[in-house]
Amino acid sequence: MSSFTYPQRYLSKINFPFICYKFNYFPLISSIAVVALSGALKLHFAYEFLGRTLPLHSFIVAILVTYASYAFDRGVGCSEDEERSGLFKSALLVSAVIATILSFVLFANILLAVPYIIGYLYARGIGGHRLKGGYGVKNAVVALTWASTMPIFLCDLSFAGLLVYLFFFSKSFVNTIIYDVRDAERDREAGIATIPTLMSKTRLRALLILISAATHCILIAAALGGMLACADILVLSALHSLGYIIIYSGACNVLRNTLVDGEWILYTLYSSFRAVFL
């Protein structure tokens, strides 16, 4: 009995794992997965800071929303060779659509469209105008997406809630600037105005430390005053943020994804250890 095998160009169109292996997309997939999990953990800690418990279905929805937003952005922005771009872009966009549909099935709230709308304007824009502007606009948009999504789940506009949203806005704003440092030289050569291209490393580091320290001090004071919970997590976040700002506002890239994108995973491990042993 004769055997028949598909040529690779056909196999790659129908076999998603093969696409990932052939074009080495596993780092990108793992990066999106870490960001999606971290997004849900941010919401988890937002609930914790307010002394509440995050419902399981909301946790799952947060993963889906974060995944869909990042997968859509990466799919639209994929600019490698035509075969690589076309194949993986389609897979990312299809998975983003599926995640979006599932999120609305689990959380039927029209306000859930807000992060998707912001994500679309960020990745695609309207009339050629996107929200990926320079001078910190991109950083503020990403941070605002996080901060505006949390009230949809928490339904809390109290002063304590606003402090929590401010905290996550600040954290996201600082972290996106940290990631812009990596591309500072290339952006400068291309004439793209990002905050790291406009400031010296010393001034940039001082600015990020100031933003982070001020926000953490406000939240820690609120926690010590009984307005918020989990003061130890906030102290840990303050120290951790100070560390990676000092390290990654320079040329170092070692373990950056783990320590920056994965910070809330690290805090979850600490929280679990505390619950079991302390």
Language model feature labels by segment:
Residues M1-F26:
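Short, Lys/Arg-rich, polar N-terminal cytosolic tail immediately upstream
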Residues R84-L157, L242-Y248:
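Intramembrane alpha-helical segments
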Residues N139-E185, A213:
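Functional transmembrane core segments of multi-pass inner-membrane proteins
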Residues H44-R52, I98-F107, P151-D156, C217-G225, ...:
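Hydrophobic alpha-helical transmembrane segments
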